Amino acid sequence: MSIKYIASSKLPTPWGVFEMHGFEDSETGKEHVALTFGTLSPDAPILGRIHSECLTGDALFSLRCDCGFQLQTAMQNVAEEGQGFILYLRQEGRGIGLLNKIRAYELQDQGANTVEANERLGFEADMRKYDMIIPMMEKIGVAKVRLMTNNPRKVKAMQSFGLEVVERVPLQVGKNRYNEGYLKTKSTELGHMMSEHHFTDADTEAKKD
């Protein structure tokens, strides 16, 4: 395995102080991060999330996806739980990279959906891999997970690596007029387990504020 642990530090956030653990993939040069909160036990089911990098959603507040909403909600949920983890994986654009993601967005602006755009660029709908989580989970000492995700591929990935997914916790947030089609495509073509009636509508929440 090419993933190497590098260092840890405190990370103060609006939801509390997390511990940030840095990892480096010597084969790809990519740097991944595990955030932990509270005391984690290998014997207890721990609330957590596998989150793939989304610069546009996580840092630039894009409404084209639900990624930023999911990350913030997951961190808040972990803090409220008193313990948990977030694995932040550098797999921008479902694995195609930032510039190709912008190219895909350009095609989406012309009418393609998120899957069609990737395929027109010569990529699979989802290029992500999850084998890097094995040493990351070993480092933070978690073996049983209550996984916050709508994506069955993440559940299967954890199970295939010998981790026990005790519960799948839906994370359905961030629906708005800009990403309705994107969310529908994730459900119908990528198999994400989502029910429209259980979404928090970001537009509605903004109006409440």
Curated annotation (Swiss-Prot):
Active site: D126, R128
Cofactor binding note from Swiss-Prot or TrEMBL: Binds 1 zinc ion per subunit.
Organism superkingdom: Bacteria
Residues bound to Zn(2+): C54, C65, C67
E.C. code: 3.5.4.25
A GO-annotated cellular component: cytosol
Pathway note: Cofactor biosynthesis; riboflavin biosynthesis; 5-amino-6-(D-ribitylamino)uracil from GTP: step 1/4
Annotated Gene3D superfamilies: GTP cyclohydrolase II (3.40.50.10990)
Required cofactor(s): Zn(2+)
InterPro entries: GTP_cyclohydro_II, RibA, RibA-like_sf
GO molecular function, one term: GTP cyclohydrolase II activity
Binding-site residues for GTP, renumbered to this chain: R49, I50, H51, S52, E53, Q70, E92, G93, R94, T114, T149, K154
PANTHER family associated with the record: 3,4-DIHYDROXY-2-BUTANONE 4-PHOSPHATE SYNTHASE, GTP CYCLOHYDROLASE II-RELATED
UniProt similarity note: Belongs to the GTP cyclohydrolase II family.
Protein name, as recorded: GTP cyclohydrolase-2
Organism, as annotated: Shewanella halifaxensis (strain HAW-EB4)
